[in-house]
A protein has these predicted regions:
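Generic structural detector for well-ordered beta-strands
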Residues: 6-10, 37, 64, 96-98, ...
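Beta-strand/loop substructures that line and gate deep hydrophobic ligand-binding cavities in soluble
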Residues: 62, 80-129
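Glycine-rich portal/gate segments that line the openings of hydrophobic small-molecule binding cavities
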Residues: 38-81, 137
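Hydrophobic ligand-binding cavity/cleft-lining segments
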Residues: 1-49, 151-152
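Hydrophobic pocket/interface hotspot
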Residues: 16, 26, 65, 107-109, ...
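A conserved amphipathic terminal alpha-helix motif
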Residues: 118-152
Length: 152
């Protein structure tokens, strides 16, 4: 499954980069993210609760930073298992920041996701709807945090 989102944040690119590449800052913006901890250089672990159809579950995920080119590009690999190991997820994500002007930044996010196990059996349509909803909630929370912080 491929996810691609593009949105604008009213803040300078350096501010967006600093926020979005800080796990402590960005984690509260991710729907269902309970905690994030650094487990090594450029390596993080998180717990994420999600709901897909009638199933509520939690994934334990490991995130590795594959590449960073501040303040314009980063790529990540995420791997995780659902509690009870009923499902596995693997994703490669890319984040690009483009300066629109000194006060606005375009964010482009793409992710190739492979989900196997019981959750992988859900129809592609349902998975896309869940991913889209999570993405929209993330964008709203991220904008609020960055744009409100920029006003103070």
């Amino acid at each position: 499954m491929k996810i691609e989102k593009s949105f604008t944040v009213v803040a300078p690119r350096e501010n967006v980069w600093e926020f979005i590449t800080s796990p402590e800052s960005v984690a509260p913006c991710i729907p269902g993210c309970e905690q994030v901890e650094q487990v090594g250089p450029k390596k993080y672990r998180a717990g994420i609760k999600i709901k897909i159809g009638p199933i509520r579950t939690k994934f334990k995920v490991d995130i590795d930073v594959l590449e960073e080119r501040p303040p314009e590009f980063a790529s990540y690999q995420t791997q995780g298992v659902e509690g009870g190991k009923a499902s596995r997820i693997k994703a490669v994500s890319k984040l690009s920041l483009t300066e629109i002007d000194s006060a606005a930044t375009e964010v482009l996010y793409t992710s190739e996701i492979n989900l196997i196990g019981r959750l992988g059996k859900f129809s592609q349509g349902m998975m896309n709807k869940v991913a889209d909803s999570i993405g929209e909630d993330f964008i709203l929370a991220l904008r609020k945090e960055i744009e409100v912080a920029g006003e103070s």
